[in-house]
């Protein structure tokens, strides 16, 4: 009888410890994701907490990027994320290279491109990453204010993500990868397009 009680107690404490640990991880993840609203990760990055744990700060992805748009986060963002890879969507954007050199360079698999069922079956169907969210700012976008523009037309590499109606652009958020190329092409001042982190609540 005593053995049964001891066994039940041990099981209870194991469950309690497991739940406590799970709660700690969830809180840490929530805090990290709140901070992650201030940056964008390179293509095919793991979820933020997994990325932080996997990224070795080797800088190989940045070296491999032919467009020099990957950079290490500065220490001002916190020691836990310092030197981890981030994407400069404000001054260049991800060109989504066909061979994904940054992903290939990541031996730690912090950047890991999934293989679709179609690709697995030998079909040439591209898999697009989800890096950020892009949106049209109608108050600043020139065609919404009167004059014609079209500067961003043709900038988007994903079919159907950036479309035009009556010469006014719109973004299909379900298709958009958040690469930032439309933002780079925008000639309005201030910019008529905004690109924000997936973790930013708006």
Regions found by a protein language model. Give the residues of each.
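Non-ligating segments of multi-cofactor redox enzymes
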Residues: 1-202
